[in-house]
A protein has these predicted regions:
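Active-site histidine-anchored catalytic micro-motif
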Residues: 113-115
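Conserved, mostly hydrophobic/aromatic
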Residues: 120
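C-terminal accessory/tail domains of diverse enzymes
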Residues: 1-111, 125-206
Length: 206
């Protein structure tokens, strides 16, 4: 059975500056009618829980060129202005909520510059082994068009948004359908599983 877009869960990470992580969390908490919590740690995390009990995080990212507004212009800023918003797992029906959060952040000063990017992670739990094969094949065949349409910078294509590796695609194409979920989950396709590490290399492929 084909998987429709309305059945697809996703999460996103949006990099921004112009607003501190604390202020971003506080303003989104106001939007949700909840409160912001300082989780701290190396990434200086602030978190907010929405009305459905899902946690949104605002954390430091070293790749962001930080700026703040001063007297109507943008000037260099400290690391507190490095803000990466990490959404929880969202359903298609929650797209409006994500849009509200983004509008809220923009209203209170969030902006992007050439150093900022966005990652979208697609949940594979509703996929079958065959649909995963098909999805990767389609993505591989349309990558050049997608990269051009999204205006992906050459620098990001070489580092943070690399194209699908043909060798990985070929491995998956050759696998029996029954083994794909286990081999993807355990990292056998990628060589290792570092997918839960914030800066692991396996995360930076389209």
């Amino acid at each position: 059975m084909a998987i429709g877009i309305q059945d697809q869960y996703f999460g996103t990470e949006i990099e921004m500056t112009g607003i501190t992580r604390q202020r971003a969390a506080e303003k989104v908490a106001e939007l949700f009618g909840t409160r912001a919590v300082c989780d701290g740690g190396y990434y200086g995390v602030w978190s907010v829980t929405d009305q459905e009990g899902k946690k949104w995080k605002f954390m430091y990212d070293g790749s962001i060129y930080t700026e703040r507004r001063e007297r109507g212009r943008m000037v260099p800023a400290g690391r507190e202005y490095s803000t990466e918003m990490v959404s929880p797992k969202l359903s298609y029906g929650e797209m409006g909520k994500l849009q509200e959060v983004v509008r809220c952040l923009r209203h209170y000063g969030a902006k992007v510059n050439a150093s900022c990017g966005q990652h979208v992670h697609v949940d594979a739990s509703n996929h079958t082994p065959r649909s995963l094969k098909n999805a990767m094949t389609i993505m591989y065949s349309k990558e050049d068009i997608l990269f051009k349409a999204l205006k992906v910078q050459t620098s990001r294509e070489q580092e943070y948004c690399q194209k699908v590796r043909p060798i990985v695609l070929e491995k998956i194409r050759r696998m029996p359908n029954s083994t794909i979920p286990w081999k993807v989950e355990t990292g056998m396709v990628w060589g290792r599983d570092g997918s839960h590490d914030h800066y692991d290399d396996t995360r930076y492929y389209a």
